[in-house]
Regions:
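Glycine-rich active-site/cofactor-binding loop and its immediate structural neighborhood
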Residues: 254-256
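Short glycine/threonine-rich catalytic loop with a Thr-x-Gly-x-Asp
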Residues: 82-86, 246-251
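C-terminal nucleotide
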Residues: 2-12, 16-18, 25, 33-60, ...
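DPxDG-like acidic metal-binding loop motif
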Residues: 28, 79-101
């Protein structure tokens, strides 16, 4: 059995989703490829946790798993922050269960969260399993499929450089005295942003993205961590100057950022101006997919 699973980029709702607010997440066209192999070798903590969750449901594939996440790495083999662990969890769950149904999602979510010691919203696992652009709450919870784009806007994903550990940023931000104020502002903006995206209001969506990025920056400042790094700030300013908007994609501190521009052809110009690399990625409408093997 062979499967492939997309990566993810968080579009809106960082931090606030941990407190019950909606988030928006996109599956992206970097795909993990997994296959069954006869012998079980050394497994990552995520795969081990998924195996434990799968075995609790009954018979599973007893052999090994091989999961290739090379598409989630940069030219220097650095991880890009595109959700390789979530994609690996979904791939492992499908291979162990021998199917692609909803039980696979539940096993992947349980295993991924166990490997993270109970942390994480689960929206990355949701995107990996379902594909497309989604509005979703803390998982398991409501999920709404949204259009892959707003007419007149182009999504670009930029690599910001080395990242900080997500859990350390979340811990620092939650410890900030102003956490409750900021998380309420982020929650309000996330809800308004989902509504703007749903109604395909490009101008309102861009305004919400800019405001969300500023609020993330304010939270990071109060918490003493660079949620918005200097490269990300350059991108946010540059995108706005081009008539668009940008923000960190995830907890911040590096990894990737998302930007929307009215003109797709200006993405290379923006990348050159801000000194960052636009990744060759797009929204992937397909989530978990069973692939044909040469021997089949």
């Amino acid at each position: 059995m062979k499967v492939s699973v997309p990566g993810k980029a968080l579009l809106l709702g960082e931090y606030a989703v941990l407190e019950g607010a909606p988030a928006m997440v996109a599956a992206v066209s970097a795909r993990a490829v997994g296959r069954r192999v006869p012998r079980r070798g050394r497994e990552s903590p995520v795969v081990q946790s998924v195996r434990t969750a799968a075995e609790a449901l009954g018979a599973t594939h007893g052999g090994g798993l091989e999961i290739d996440t090379d598409g989630f790495r940069g030219p220097r083999r650095n991880k890009l922050g595109l959700g390789s662990s979530a994609a690996s969890a979904v791939a492992a769950a499908a291979l162990l269960r021998g199917r692609t149904d909803e039980t696979v999602y539940r096993v992947a979510l349980e295993g991924h969260r166990a490997a993270a010691r109970g942390k994480g919203s689960g929206v990355d696992v949701c995107a990996a399993y379902r594909g497309g652009v989604l509005a979703c709450a803390y998982q398991p919870g409501p999920v709404e499929a949204l259009p892959s784009e707003i007419p007149g806007l182009h999504l670009a994903i930029f690599h910001l450089g080395p990242s900080a550990k997500t859990s350390s940023f979340i811990r620092a931000c939650r410890a900030a005295p102003s956490w409750n104020r900021w998380v309420q502002e982020l929650a309000d903006l996330a809800g308004a942003g989902v509504a703007a995206y749903r109604s395909a209001d490009a101008g309102l969506w861009l305004n919400r993205v800019r405001a969300f990025g500023r609020a993330m920056e304010g939270l990071g400042h109060d918490a003493g961590v660079p949620v918005v790094t200097e490269p990300c700030r350059r991108l946010m300013d540059g995108a706005e100057a081009f008539g668009g908007a940008a923000k960190p994609a995830g907890a911040g501190g590096g990894d990737v950022a998302v930007a929307w521009l009215p003109d797709r052809s200006r993405v290379p110009e923006l990348a050159e101006q801000v000194g960052l690399r636009a990744l060759p990625l797009s929204v992937d409408p397909v989530g978990l997919r069973r692939e044909e093997e040469a021997s089949e």
